[in-house]
Amino acid sequence: MLIKLLTKVFGSRNDRTLRRMRKVVNIINAMEPEMEKLSDEELKGKTAEFRARLEKGEVLENLIPEAFAVVREASKRVFGMRHFDVQLLGGMVLNERCIAEMRTGEGKTLTATLPAYLNALTGKGVHVVTVNDYLAQRDAENNRPLFEFLGLTVGINLPGMPAPAKREAYAADITYGTNNEYGFDYLRDNMAFSPEERVQRKLHYALVDEVDSILIDEARTPLIISGPAEDSSEMYKRVNKIIPHLIRQEKEDSETFQGEGHFSVDEKSRQVNLTERGLVLIEELLVKEGIMDEGESLYSPANIMLMHHVTAALRAHALFTRDVDYIVKDGEVIIVDEHTGRTMQGRRWSDGLHQAVEAKEGVQIQNENQTLASITFQNYFRLYEKLAGMTGTADTEAFEFSSIYKLDTVVVPTNRPMIRKDLPDLVYMTEAEKIQAIIEDIKERTAKGQPVLVGTISIEKSELVSNELTKAGIKHNVLNAKFHANEAAIVAQAGYPAAVTIATNMAGRGTDIVLGGSWQAEVAALENPTAEQIEKIKADWQVRHDAVLAAGGLHIIGTERHESRRIDNQLRGRSGRQGDAGSSRFYLSMEDALMRIFASDRVSGMMRKLGMKPGEAIEHPWVTKAIANAQRKVESRNFDIRKQLLEYDDVANDQRRAIYSQRNELLDVSDVSETINSIREDVFKATIDAYIPPQSLEEMWDIPGLQERLKNDFDLDLPIAEWLDKEPELHEETLRERILAQSIEVYQRKEEVVGAEMMRHFEKGVMLQTLDSLWKEHLAAMDYLRQGIHLRGYAQKDPKQEYKRESFSMFAAMLESLKYEVISTLSKVQVRMPEEVEELEQQRRMEAERLAQMQQLSYQDDDSAAAAALAAQTGERKVGRNDPCPCGSGKKYKQCHGRLQ
């Protein structure tokens, strides 16, 4: 009560921010007459003037009123469009490292030109981030005339572009691209073998469009660059044949874990577990298929990878559904993004899951991959000096933006008041009744000429509704991941009178639905249209536009509630833009995923008590409230998962930054001989210490062992025992010095053969290659550690602290290995002629190119229990009895594959 009273008196934080900014808007408006008087040349000259002022030390914020006034005037001259006051407010919000919540149709693309221009004046580059290539290209081309009029360059960063074109795009003042491409370029730059191969500049200012989609929905999606591992496609096919013999256990009995079924499915965590009965059957079937020998157990250490195949195949069959989670197109399994409903060409699930799905669908199985580099969007975008974003729906996630990205959310008012009617939800008992009610509603709406947009949560559901509409004889367009190319065209005409459009999730997001259809699209379809033709098209459109408004504007039908209220709001937000009329309603059934998992028992009990008849719907505030609570539960659970993921990833992130900065330093210098010399001293000291403990008696020395180690690891054949026999005065210190001096002498002789310059080049190559190879193994080991770390909780230890401690010691061990391997490689390599060094370099380049061609940019299935990635690389590595089992089950080794040992 008191808080409400204080808010009324002083205004909310949002009100106070807007009040402060409105004063600046008044200053900008006052400058308008002055700007109108300037010639085009004088207006263009303002950019150079602003840059000169910045160089003299003026603060960027002081330029806001004048810079925004210049952009507004330029936009009037180039586009004939004047920024509204609310767009100026949005521009200021975006410049202040905030999220601007601007409703659909309020002109976010035009708003973005203001902060993009202002921050481009620094010359450090501005990255405008969009959700797909089409929007990146569209926005760049639309805004290019404005920026070029003001003397700024514009670049577009698209997947598959050659490195020189990418470098040029990043060198531009303002670069447009997708979140995936920026992230992958960052990773690729940190795998480059020479400074010239890098494409990005230092990350300065990112302006993220649809910021909720990128920073929240995709936050759990690490970007992974992976190279090919060993081929095991045959095994996937063989294991796949066995899975149909298993029966799913309907209810998991947590006490005994017994039941009639062979495996249980946890839909919330997307995991599959074998029951005891299932384990026995699987072992029998594996023996029958000749995959496993009789008498062997699936839990024997030799079968760790087999267990991984079985788990992957089970998950592929039980949890992943065709046309919901993926589609099969041209003999390929293509992932469908669960948040946007779009296909993700080129992305692959990790941990063998993608191969298991390929085996299930009977398409060609592609090789498994090994992670070479990875980063989450959360950590990538936090690398920017300055970050801001805009979306139509951010307020529900304001707390997350603030706690993870330190970004405040400011709700920017609409230019015209909102008059859309959001009707209460209708809840049916079954899916079939719900679909029937939707068809009836569509018939009713289209009969009076009202356009309808139907939002579904998956391709499968969109095709189900489409089939029913076809049966009912209603013409309609389907917009889902399968028809990506026509997306914008279909959306542009979704406002046509009586048009019916079915869209998955947010397909077509970023394209406005204009009531009456898009007259621009009609004009674009004509070849060289005359002025009369254009006028006629506009006049026809005006008639249609008025007719649609009279019929009630665009009507939105939601066929199911999403896990997040925000995505529901996005669907609703497609209607009622710029103060237009519109309406929306969600249709639900007790068979919907959200209701089944989170709200079923209470609500269905309530509905039965009310004596529901088939085809009848319940429309009550209690039900709507129960659904909102279910969504809140899911949202908070997802937030906790993302927060947990970030806390764990922060550990890896610190290590990643350390490795990448060291790698970049290495790339930028041409001579690493000083580093090599200091590393050599450390390595030889540690090696000698292992055989001659410091300040020890001669009886404690292991001279034969030391001689053998120096010979095997450093190619140093030294008669140490002979020296000690012949020279009694040789003590520990002088012996150490002599061994080091001998190693330097041998190395210098090699250098004389190939020449100093060639040797420096070779040293740098060896360091880079060793660093990359060890970092790759370290990533797999970290992944592996992460899978079982939660079990430390049972030992009353904080898993997070344990993870930090262990990963730090692994990192320290990796750095020690790096030193050792570099010196060992350089000592053992036999080089005789400069040509041989050049040949080695050439081999390295060819290997890098081969890897680059085979690299996969993959989509990490975030809930997956990773398989024994490290075990696969290191073969028969000894696993401690209390370590997490390498099969990825999450159990201790002694309770899993170590049970029989």
From Swiss-Prot:
It catalyses: ATP + H2O + cellular proteinSide 1 = ADP + phosphate + cellular proteinSide 2. GO terms for biological process: intracellular protein transmembrane transport; protein import; protein targeting; protein transport by the Sec complex. Pfam families: P-loop_SecA, SEC-C, SecA_DEAD, SecA_PP_bind, SecA_SW. It is an enzyme of class 7 (translocase). Induction: Repressed under conditions of excess protein secretion capacity and derepressed when protein secretion becomes limiting. This is regulated by SecM. GO terms for cellular component: cell envelope Sec protein transport complex; cytosol; plasma membrane. Monomer and homodimer. Part of the essential Sec protein translocation apparatus which comprises SecA, SecYEG and auxiliary proteins SecDF-YajC and YidC. Belongs to the SecA family. This is Protein translocase subunit SecA. It comes from Escherichia coli O1:K1 / APEC.
